[in-house]
Amino acid sequence: MRVKGGPTTRRRRKKWLNQAEGTFGTRHASYKVAKQTVIKSAKYAFRDRKNKKREFRALWIQRLNGALRELGVTYSVFINLLKKQQITINRKMLSEIAIHDHEAFKKLVKEVTGK
């Protein structure tokens, strides 16, 4: 007698359909399309977890450069001076200081540049 898989097949397909929940149209209803959608979304998620790091670093650098140029220093010069003086503070913290505590940032820039 031939076994078609009944409950096993249903459970497997249901798993894919549940993962595709919240998508529009056939993407959440059709097994074949839902499976393709979930696989593609996983690829995007993997790729974008890497891109997120790049994008945030670029954002911090842009913020720093803007804040530094107001004080008459460029980003590249400032980072170079920090490294020469062996000051280890990451770009994220520097940009947060520049945004939220501008006076402290000014003092830090004066200290590093000697102006």
UniProtKB/Swiss-Prot annotation:
PANTHER family: 39S RIBOSOMAL PROTEIN L20 (PTHR10986)
Top-rank taxon: Bacteria
Similarity-based family: Belongs to the bacterial ribosomal protein bL20 family.
A Gene Ontology BP annotation from the UniProt entry: translation
Lineage, uppermost ranks: Bacteria, Bacillati, Mycoplasmatota, Mycoplasmoidales, Mycoplasmoidaceae
CDD domains to which the protein is assigned, alphabetical: Ribosomal_L20
Protein name, as recorded: Large ribosomal subunit protein bL20
Organism, scientific name: Mycoplasmoides gallisepticum (strain R(low / passage 15 / clone 2)) (Mycoplasma gallisepticum)
InterPro entries: Ribosomal_bL20, RIBOSOMAL_L20_CS, Ribosomal_protein_bL20_C
Gene name for this UniProt entry: rplT
GO molecular function, one term: structural constituent of ribosome
Coiled-coil boundaries: none
Key words of the record: Ribonucleoprotein, Ribosomal protein, RNA-binding, rRNA-binding
Disulfide bond positions: none
GO cellular component: ribonucleoprotein complex; ribosome
